[in-house]
Amino acid sequence: MLQPAWSLFREETQLEADASKMKITVLGTGDTVGTPKVNCDCEVCRQAKEEGRERLRTSILIEHNGQNLLIDTTPDLRRQLLASNAPHIDGVIWTHGHFDHFMGFADFYRVQREIIKVYGAPEVLDYCGSIFSFIRHEEIPVLPFEPVEICGMEVTLFPGVHDTPTYGMRIRADGKTFVYSCDTRAEISKESLSLMRDADLLLLDGIFPPGVNIAKHMNTADAERLAKELNAKEFWCVHMSHKIPWDYKYAASDMQSWIL
Protein backbone atom coordinates (compact mmCIF):
# COMPACT_ATOMS: atom_id res chain seq x y z
CA MET A 1 0.00 0.00 0.00
CA LEU A 2 1.29 3.48 -0.87
CA GLN A 3 1.99 5.81 2.01
CA PRO A 4 2.29 9.61 1.99
CA ALA A 5 5.86 10.69 1.45
CA TRP A 6 5.96 12.78 4.61
CA SER A 7 5.26 9.71 6.73
CA LEU A 8 8.23 7.92 5.22
CA PHE A 9 10.87 10.63 5.42
CA ARG A 10 13.92 9.59 7.41
CA GLU A 11 15.87 11.95 9.59
CA GLU A 12 19.60 12.08 8.87
CA THR A 13 20.37 10.49 12.22
CA GLN A 14 18.49 7.39 11.10
CA LEU A 15 20.69 6.97 8.03
CA GLU A 16 23.81 5.72 9.77
CA ALA A 17 23.60 2.12 8.67
CA ASP A 18 25.72 -0.94 8.17
CA ALA A 19 27.96 -0.43 5.14
CA SER A 20 26.74 -3.76 3.77
CA LYS A 21 23.34 -2.20 3.15
CA MET A 22 22.49 0.02 0.20
CA LYS A 23 22.39 3.72 0.96
CA ILE A 24 20.48 5.36 -1.87
CA THR A 25 20.68 9.15 -2.24
CA VAL A 26 18.89 11.21 -4.87
CA LEU A 27 21.42 13.89 -5.79
CA GLY A 28 18.78 15.72 -7.79
CA THR A 29 15.06 15.35 -8.48
CA GLY A 30 14.47 17.83 -11.29
CA ASP A 31 13.73 17.55 -14.99
CA THR A 32 15.90 18.71 -17.87
CA VAL A 33 15.75 22.41 -16.89
CA GLY A 34 15.62 22.06 -13.11
CA THR A 35 13.67 24.13 -10.59
CA PRO A 36 13.57 27.08 -10.32
CA LYS A 37 13.40 27.40 -14.08
CA VAL A 38 15.36 30.24 -15.66
CA ASN A 39 13.17 33.30 -16.39
CA CYS A 40 10.09 31.77 -14.77
CA ASP A 41 7.92 33.55 -12.22
CA CYS A 42 5.40 30.80 -11.52
CA GLU A 43 4.39 30.10 -7.92
CA VAL A 44 6.69 27.09 -7.56
CA CYS A 45 9.70 28.97 -8.95
CA ARG A 46 8.97 32.07 -6.84
CA GLN A 47 8.76 29.92 -3.73
CA ALA A 48 12.02 28.21 -4.67
CA LYS A 49 13.84 31.52 -4.97
CA GLU A 50 12.32 32.97 -1.81
CA GLU A 51 13.04 29.88 0.32
CA GLY A 52 16.29 28.73 -1.27
CA ARG A 53 14.78 25.52 -2.65
CA GLU A 54 16.08 23.68 -5.71
CA ARG A 55 15.55 20.63 -7.84
CA LEU A 56 18.81 19.81 -9.57
CA ARG A 57 18.75 17.41 -12.50
CA THR A 58 17.92 13.83 -11.49
CA SER A 59 20.73 11.43 -10.59
CA ILE A 60 21.29 8.83 -7.88
CA LEU A 61 24.22 7.75 -5.73
CA ILE A 62 24.24 4.23 -4.25
CA GLU A 63 26.80 3.39 -1.56
CA HIS A 64 27.30 -0.29 -0.79
CA ASN A 65 30.15 -2.17 0.91
CA GLY A 66 32.57 0.71 0.44
CA GLN A 67 31.79 1.13 -3.26
CA ASN A 68 29.93 4.00 -4.88
CA LEU A 69 27.69 3.68 -7.93
CA LEU A 70 26.39 6.76 -9.74
CA ILE A 71 23.28 6.56 -11.90
CA ASP A 72 23.50 9.25 -14.58
CA THR A 73 25.92 12.17 -14.70
CA THR A 74 23.93 15.38 -14.88
CA PRO A 75 25.04 18.90 -15.80
CA ASP A 76 24.81 19.58 -12.04
CA LEU A 77 27.27 16.80 -11.20
CA ARG A 78 30.00 18.97 -9.63
CA ARG A 79 27.56 20.51 -7.17
CA GLN A 80 25.97 17.15 -6.50
CA LEU A 81 29.26 15.42 -5.71
CA LEU A 82 30.30 18.28 -3.44
CA ALA A 83 26.97 18.10 -1.61
CA SER A 84 27.44 14.36 -1.07
CA ASN A 85 31.04 14.85 0.15
CA ALA A 86 32.43 13.82 -3.25
CA PRO A 87 32.96 10.10 -2.67
CA HIS A 88 35.20 8.14 -4.99
CA ILE A 89 33.00 6.86 -7.82
CA ASP A 90 33.58 3.20 -8.68
CA GLY A 91 30.98 2.90 -11.42
CA VAL A 92 28.54 4.92 -13.51
CA ILE A 93 25.36 3.76 -15.24
CA TRP A 94 23.97 5.87 -18.07
CA THR A 95 20.23 5.41 -18.57
CA HIS A 96 20.03 7.19 -21.93
CA GLY A 97 21.53 9.81 -24.18
CA HIS A 98 19.67 13.00 -23.27
CA PHE A 99 21.99 15.76 -22.13
CA ASP A 100 20.54 16.13 -18.64
CA HIS A 101 21.42 12.51 -17.91
CA PHE A 102 25.01 12.22 -19.11
CA MET A 103 26.68 15.50 -20.11
CA GLY A 104 28.00 16.15 -16.60
CA PHE A 105 30.48 13.29 -17.06
CA ALA A 106 32.92 16.02 -18.10
CA ASP A 107 33.12 17.05 -14.44
CA PHE A 108 35.31 14.01 -13.80
CA TYR A 109 38.07 15.69 -15.83
CA ARG A 110 41.17 16.02 -13.61
CA VAL A 111 39.12 14.98 -10.58
CA GLN A 112 39.44 11.20 -10.48
CA ARG A 113 42.65 9.68 -11.82
CA GLU A 114 41.50 6.08 -11.98
CA ILE A 115 39.71 4.82 -15.06
CA ILE A 116 35.98 5.08 -14.44
CA LYS A 117 33.85 2.06 -15.33
CA VAL A 118 30.74 3.14 -17.21
CA TYR A 119 27.86 0.73 -17.72
CA GLY A 120 24.85 0.94 -19.98
CA ALA A 121 23.00 -0.59 -22.89
CA PRO A 122 25.25 -0.85 -25.98
CA GLU A 123 23.45 1.87 -27.98
CA VAL A 124 23.56 4.23 -25.00
CA LEU A 125 27.30 3.72 -24.50
CA ASP A 126 27.98 4.17 -28.22
CA TYR A 127 26.30 7.57 -28.23
CA CYS A 128 27.29 8.98 -24.84
CA GLY A 129 30.82 7.57 -24.70
CA SER A 130 31.85 9.01 -28.06
CA ILE A 131 31.59 12.53 -26.66
CA PHE A 132 34.00 11.92 -23.76
CA SER A 133 37.15 10.57 -25.39
CA PHE A 134 39.15 13.08 -23.32
CA ILE A 135 38.17 11.33 -20.07
CA ARG A 136 39.71 7.95 -19.29
CA HIS A 137 36.87 5.51 -18.88
CA GLU A 138 36.02 1.89 -19.60
CA GLU A 139 32.71 1.20 -21.27
CA ILE A 140 31.01 -2.03 -20.20
CA PRO A 141 27.91 -2.95 -22.25
CA VAL A 142 24.97 -4.38 -20.34
CA LEU A 143 22.18 -6.19 -22.17
CA PRO A 144 18.60 -5.65 -20.98
CA PHE A 145 17.03 -8.38 -18.85
CA GLU A 146 20.44 -9.96 -18.15
CA PRO A 147 21.56 -9.50 -14.50
CA VAL A 148 25.14 -8.32 -13.97
CA GLU A 149 27.15 -7.54 -10.85
CA ILE A 150 28.09 -3.89 -10.42
CA CYS A 151 29.73 -2.65 -7.22
CA GLY A 152 28.70 -5.86 -5.48
CA MET A 153 25.02 -5.48 -6.38
CA GLU A 154 22.88 -7.35 -8.90
CA VAL A 155 21.76 -4.90 -11.59
CA THR A 156 19.23 -5.69 -14.32
CA LEU A 157 18.38 -3.13 -17.00
CA PHE A 158 14.95 -2.98 -18.62
CA PRO A 159 13.68 -0.73 -21.44
CA GLY A 160 11.26 2.11 -20.85
CA VAL A 161 9.15 4.01 -23.40
CA HIS A 162 10.82 7.27 -24.41
CA ASP A 163 11.85 9.06 -27.61
CA THR A 164 15.36 7.57 -27.45
CA PRO A 165 16.55 4.19 -26.13
CA THR A 166 16.12 4.50 -22.36
CA TYR A 167 16.57 2.01 -19.55
CA GLY A 168 15.38 1.67 -16.00
CA MET A 169 16.93 -0.79 -13.59
CA ARG A 170 16.32 -3.20 -10.76
CA ILE A 171 19.12 -3.32 -8.19
CA ARG A 172 19.30 -6.04 -5.55
CA ALA A 173 21.57 -6.51 -2.56
CA ASP A 174 21.24 -8.27 0.77
CA GLY A 175 17.66 -9.33 0.09
CA LYS A 176 16.46 -5.79 -0.73
CA THR A 177 15.27 -4.46 -4.08
CA PHE A 178 15.50 -0.93 -5.48
CA VAL A 179 13.78 -0.08 -8.77
CA TYR A 180 14.41 3.12 -10.71
CA SER A 181 12.73 4.20 -13.93
CA CYS A 182 12.60 7.77 -15.15
CA ASP A 183 12.03 9.29 -18.59
CA THR A 184 9.32 6.86 -19.62
CA ARG A 185 5.63 6.69 -20.33
CA ALA A 186 3.46 4.36 -18.28
CA GLU A 187 2.92 1.92 -21.16
CA ILE A 188 5.94 -0.17 -20.21
CA SER A 189 6.26 -3.71 -21.57
CA LYS A 190 5.06 -6.66 -19.50
CA GLU A 191 8.60 -8.00 -19.44
CA SER A 192 9.89 -4.76 -17.94
CA LEU A 193 6.99 -4.54 -15.49
CA SER A 194 7.77 -8.03 -14.20
CA LEU A 195 11.18 -6.76 -13.04
CA MET A 196 9.67 -3.72 -11.34
CA ARG A 197 7.27 -5.49 -9.01
CA ASP A 198 7.45 -5.70 -5.20
CA ALA A 199 10.32 -3.24 -4.78
CA ASP A 200 11.34 -2.09 -1.33
CA LEU A 201 11.93 1.33 -2.89
CA LEU A 202 10.52 2.54 -6.22
CA LEU A 203 11.48 5.86 -7.84
CA LEU A 204 9.48 6.90 -10.90
CA ASP A 205 9.27 9.73 -13.40
CA GLY A 206 6.59 12.23 -12.39
CA ILE A 207 7.29 15.25 -14.55
CA PHE A 208 3.88 16.97 -14.64
CA PRO A 209 0.70 17.18 -12.53
CA PRO A 210 -2.38 15.08 -13.34
CA GLY A 211 -4.09 16.05 -16.59
CA VAL A 212 -0.89 17.14 -18.32
CA ASN A 213 0.11 14.47 -20.80
CA ILE A 214 3.15 14.36 -23.07
CA ALA A 215 4.46 11.63 -25.34
CA LYS A 216 7.57 10.62 -23.42
CA HIS A 217 6.98 11.01 -19.66
CA MET A 218 4.53 10.10 -16.92
CA ASN A 219 2.58 12.64 -14.93
CA THR A 220 2.21 12.13 -11.21
CA ALA A 221 -1.15 10.37 -11.54
CA ASP A 222 0.41 7.89 -13.98
CA ALA A 223 3.26 7.29 -11.55
CA GLU A 224 0.95 6.74 -8.58
CA ARG A 225 -1.19 4.25 -10.52
CA LEU A 226 1.89 2.36 -11.69
CA ALA A 227 3.40 2.25 -8.20
CA LYS A 228 0.17 0.81 -6.81
CA GLU A 229 0.02 -1.78 -9.60
CA LEU A 230 3.63 -2.77 -8.92
CA ASN A 231 3.00 -3.23 -5.19
CA ALA A 232 5.92 -1.02 -4.15
CA LYS A 233 6.58 -0.86 -0.42
CA GLU A 234 7.79 2.73 -0.75
CA PHE A 235 7.36 5.08 -3.70
CA TRP A 236 8.53 8.57 -4.63
CA CYS A 237 8.59 10.71 -7.75
CA VAL A 238 11.74 12.15 -9.32
CA HIS A 239 12.48 13.98 -12.59
CA MET A 240 9.87 16.58 -11.62
CA SER A 241 9.33 19.86 -13.44
CA HIS A 242 8.62 23.26 -11.93
CA LYS A 243 4.92 22.45 -12.32
CA ILE A 244 5.06 20.06 -9.35
CA PRO A 245 4.34 21.87 -6.05
CA TRP A 246 6.84 21.51 -3.24
CA ASP A 247 4.28 19.92 -0.94
CA TYR A 248 3.24 17.14 -3.34
CA LYS A 249 3.09 14.12 -1.04
CA TYR A 250 5.22 11.82 -3.22
CA ALA A 251 7.85 14.39 -4.21
CA ALA A 252 11.37 13.23 -3.38
CA SER A 253 13.79 15.97 -2.29
CA ASP A 254 17.35 16.60 -3.43
CA MET A 255 19.82 14.77 -1.14
CA GLN A 256 17.09 12.59 0.39
CA SER A 257 18.44 9.16 1.37
CA TRP A 258 17.14 5.70 2.16
CA ILE A 259 18.81 2.66 3.69
CA LEU A 260 17.84 -0.76 2.34
Residue locations for each model-derived region?
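Cationic, low-complexity basic patches in intrinsically disordered or flexible, solvent-exposed regions
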Residues: 4-7, 15
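Conserved beta-strand hairpin/beta-sheet module of binuclear metal-dependent hydrolase folds
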Residues: 8, 19-83, 166-182, 201
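Metallo-beta-lactamase
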Residues: 18, 115, 119-167, 173-174
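Short acidic-hydrophobic surface loop/beta-edge motif
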Residues: 62, 146-151, 257-260
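Active-site metal-binding motif and surrounding structural segment of the metallo-beta-lactamase
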Residues: 65-120, 198-201
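Active-site neighborhood of phospho(di)ester-bond hydrolases with catalytic His/Asp-centered motifs
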Residues: 70-74, 90-98, 120-121, 179-184, ...
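Short beta->alpha connector loops
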Residues: 74-77, 99, 123, 160-165, ...
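Binuclear metal-ion centers of metallo-dependent hydrolases, dominated by the metallo-beta-lactamase
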Residues: 188-201, 206-260
